[in-house]
UniProtKB/Swiss-Prot annotation:
It is found in: Cytoplasm. Coiled coil: none annotated. GO terms for biological process: fatty acid biosynthetic process. Catalyzes the condensation reaction of fatty acid synthesis by the addition to an acyl acceptor of two carbons from malonyl-ACP. Catalyzes the first condensation reaction which initiates fatty acid synthesis and may therefore play a role in governing the total rate of fatty acid production. Possesses both acetoacetyl-ACP synthase and acetyl transacylase activities. Its substrate specificity determines the biosynthesis of branched-chain and/or straight-chain of fatty acids. The last Arg residue of the ACP-binding site is essential for the weak association between ACP/AcpP and FabH. Keywords: Acyltransferase, Cytoplasm, Fatty acid biosynthesis, Fatty acid metabolism, Lipid biosynthesis, Lipid metabolism, Multifunctional enzyme, Transferase. This is Beta-ketoacyl-[acyl-carrier-protein] synthase III. Residues 250-254 are annotated as: ACP-binding. GO terms for cellular component: cytoplasm. The lineage of its organism: Bacteria, Bacillati, Bacillota, Bacilli, Lactobacillales. Belongs to the thiolase-like superfamily. FabH family. Pfam families: ACP_syn_III (PF08545), ACP_syn_III_C (PF08541). Gene3D superfamilies: 3.40.47.10.
């Protein structure tokens, strides 16, 4: 039987850093207001790079770390809600840029759950026996879809990318998964809405900026996501104590605080870096994963159990328990 494992991690963020104090110069806010409510202190904002540029940098790092030539890749999946364009896909641009001529490539649109959804799909591709290895990348330039006059959203988001190289393994590393969607709550978090613009349409103009009902999303995360995480831990057969770390979508520190209490696990097991990057949607979990390997908290030697959990627009939420 064929399984898959995460063998490389990488991340990349734009050089431009915007602090809370910087934002206070262009809108009615302050460092204290943002930090106390979200835990965010700064974020990286792209000035010239597109989403594909960030994803390409991650792909190049993953290949360099692995020693593989790009032609050894079988697939590339990019999770994003801020692609360069509707087509070609961001993944197709990555494929062309790195010369992965044997890989099929496509984008995954599942908002802040996108990386988890894409990773679950990639695991199944390799487990089928038809494919040996591929890249799963979360990449966003959310700065281009934000209304910078709306402080309820503008202070939250940042740009960045992270990803993993997934390849075949004789040992099982993906131990449990749970993926969910509730489209009935979809209007709680929206972006990129398009008007009907044909000569025959009677469509109304719509707001295409990212819009969010913050209270609804907070309640959804604490209620539905915590319930799903508790269920997947039970599904895995692991005791809570056997989980080394939980890497949740980096939306808000208060969500992590509440989640730890709701699930009944030590807060220190919930890794975080939103203070440095803000909410980077599909990129938040792989950036956190890569940084945690970089700083030595995670080893990639098969000795640790981690839980990855994303939640956001759709509404979508999903969790994986992985041995790394």
């Amino acid at each position: 039987m064929v399984f898959s494992k995460i063998s490389q991690v990488a991340h990349y963020t734009p050089k431009q850093v915007i602090s809370n104090d910087d934002l206070s110069q262009i809108m009615d806010t302050s460092h204290e207001w943002i930090s106390s409510r979200t835990g965010i202190e700064k974020r990286h904002i792209s000035t010239v790079e597109m989403t594909s540029d960030l994803a390409i940098r991650v792909a190049e790092q993953l290949l360099a770390g692995s020693g593989y030539d790009a032609t050894a890749l079988d697939f590339i999946i990019v999770a994003t809600i801020s692609p360069d364009a509707s087509m070609p896909s961001t993944a197709a641009k990555v494929q062309a840029a790195i010369g992965a001529t044997n890989a099929f490539a496509f984008d995954m649109t599942a908002a802040c759950s996108g990386f988890v959804f894409a990773l679950a799909m990639a695991d199944k591709l390799i487990a089928s026996g038809a494919y040996q290895r591929g890249l799963v990348i979360g990449a966003e330039t959310l700065s281009k879809i934000i209304d910078w006059q709306d402080r309820s959203t503008a202070v939250l988001f940042g740009d960045g990318a992270g990803g993993v190289l997934l390849e075949a393994s004789e040992q099982q590393h993906f131990l449990a998964e749970a993926l969910h969607t509730d489209g009935a709550q979809g209007q709680s978090l929206t972006s990129g809405q398009s008007s009907l613009r044909s000569p025959f349409s009677q469509g109304q103009e719509v707001n295409s900026f990212l819009q969010m009902d913050g209270r609804a999303i907070f309640d959804f995360a604490i209620r539905d996501v915590s319930r799903s995480i508790t269920a997947i831990i039970e599904q895995s057969g692991l005791a809570k104590e056997e989980l080394d770390y939980l890497l949740l979508h980096q939306a808000n520190r208060r969500i992590l605080d509440k989640m730890a209490k709701k699930i009944g696990m030590p807060r220190e097991k919930f890794l975080e870096n939103m203070m440095h990057y803000g909410n980077t949607s599909a990129a938040s979990i792989p950036i956190l994963l890569s940084e945690s390997v970089q700083n030595g908290q995670l080893k990639l030697d098969g000795s640790q159990h981690i839980l990855l959990s994303g939640f956001g627009g759709g509404l979508t939420w999903g969790s994986l328990i992985v041995k790394i």
